[in-house]
Amino acid sequence: MEFNQHITVLLNETIELLNIKPDGIYVDCTFGRGGHSQLILKKLSKKGKLICLDQDQEAINFANNLFKNNTNVIVIKTNFKNLKSALSAHKIFYVDGFIFDLGLSSPQLDDPKRGFSYHKNAWLDMRMDQSQNLNAHYIVNNYSFAKLVSIFKRYGEIKYPKIIADAIVKERSIKEINTTLELVEIIKKYSPKKNLFEKKHPARLFFQAIRIEVNDELNILEKAFNDAISMLNPLGVVAIISFHSLEDKIVKKVFNNYAKIKLPKEVPINNYVNKYSLLNQKIMPSTQELNDNNRSRSSILRGLIRNY
């Protein structure tokens, strides 16, 4: 894969789930490099509207350049935790479809200076919004042993968090840990030997945990999903692509809260239609997509529709 090339995951499946209305209003909450947005725009009439959100300035620059002559598109630099206020500022209060693609874009992963990858040497950064203060370098070099253990357990579901947390504290007391590959070497050096021979990289879950902490990823999901659902027009859809079990658990929890309401005994079931329904249990990449794009391997798509 070339540097900065990005292949959108579950592209056609997501657009099919949204069932685009030509005159509708659609929000791509995680623009990235605009794979979903560009396909939505092709299906919109001149009356339709597309709103693109991203907190990454490079993504915003890309979107502004891509859509500079298109009056159907509004580009907003913000975290999707600000979804409601960002849309209301543009007098948008109801929407026909939302997309959340929770994965990192390939340009973010492949750009060494962003510090997301455990395969490339870079300064420990991992900020999606590069204007914020907290970064991976601060976490690795300043968080206490107990706090490191906590984020490794909560955000990485790691079975031996104390071993690596202790190793980080020990190594940084000798020399500051500055780069991604320095951290990788510490993880490899102190990990149980059996973990070094697993298919997945031994640093993968530690990097995931630190990245989630840097960007406060999980804490903002539930609010953003609820905000999106509250703004749906009748027959509007929220489509969410998650990339690990922690994200998917939150998606399922929120969707089930709306779609699986327990009725009082006195309400006849035959006369009741829930306001919201699940569109699917889950959609996963086809064998062809997995072959074409290895980064799609852990993705899961779920959808919720407002019935009336």
Swiss-Prot record:
It comes from Ureaplasma parvum serovar 3 (strain ATCC 700970). This is Ribosomal RNA small subunit methyltransferase H. PANTHER family: 12S RRNA N4-METHYLCYTIDINE METHYLTRANSFERASE, S-ADENOSYL-METHYLTRANSFERASE MRAW. Specifically methylates the N4 position of cytidine in position 1402 (C1402) of 16S rRNA. Its EC number is 2.1.1.199. Belongs to the methyltransferase superfamily. RsmH family. Disulfide bonds: none annotated. InterPro entries: RsmH, SAM-dep_MeTrfase_MraW_recog, SAM-dependent_MTases_sf. GO terms for biological process: rRNA base methylation.
